[in-house]
Amino acid sequence: VGFDPDMMKCFEEYLSDEEGVTYKLEMKKMDFDNIITQLQGDQIDVGISGFTYDSKRKVEWSDPYLGSSQVAVIPKDSDIASTADLEGKSLVAQTGATGEAAAKEVKDAKVTGLKNVQDIMNALSANQYDAAIVDLGVAKNYVKSDEFKMLDESLMDEQNYIIAKKGNTDMIEKMNTCIKKFLASDDYAKLCKKY
């Protein structure tokens, strides 16, 4: 559930229309830090999980498809009111993701990385941390419950990309064609409103 999986369902339709072949999307849930390994091992064709550009990652990069930011999610009853209040607090973020990098920029914060968002939010719910640093789209999903709220300020602004195995430029060209079509479509506007 989320922006990325819903967008990929649109891509499935776009690819089928464009190539006259019926594409069937198969989504695999995995830890963020395993996605590139799965790409390199030909276990998956593309990775889509809020990837931000990093030249150290040896993959093919699509055009950006979504602007986003890293934000702090806190328990509803927290007295944290701004990003400045995160100083010296215990923060949790996804290992290897930009949220972890953003958390490490907070002065004197004690930062822990966990493998997936569900573990992060469960730990926050259990009051093991003062705040979770996550992607804005993820945060919006979790603050729908009465359990959490989100700080208004972002810690980091970014662009999201789709990745493919290094050398798989054909797949990236297909993704870029879909991204262009998506960004010009009503589908994009609907998903932005939804998430």
Where are these regions (language model features)?
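Beta->alpha turn/N-cap motifs
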Residues: 28-33, 42-54, 76, 94-98, ...
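Short helix-initiation/N-cap motifs at beta->coil->alpha
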Residues: 22-37, 78, 112-126, 158
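Extracytoplasmic small-molecule ligand-binding "clamshell" domains
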Residues: 1-49
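Ligand-binding clefts/hinges and TM-proximal coupling segments of bilobed small-molecule sensing domains
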Residues: 23, 101-119, 147-154, 179-195
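Flexible hinge/capping segments at coil-to-helix
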Residues: 74-91
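A ligand-binding cleft/hinge motif common to bilobed small-molecule-binding domains
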Residues: 34, 48-59, 102, 125-157
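Extended ligand-binding regions for polar small-molecule ligands
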Residues: 5-14, 97, 161-195
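Periplasmic-binding protein-like
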Residues: 66-74, 136, 140-180
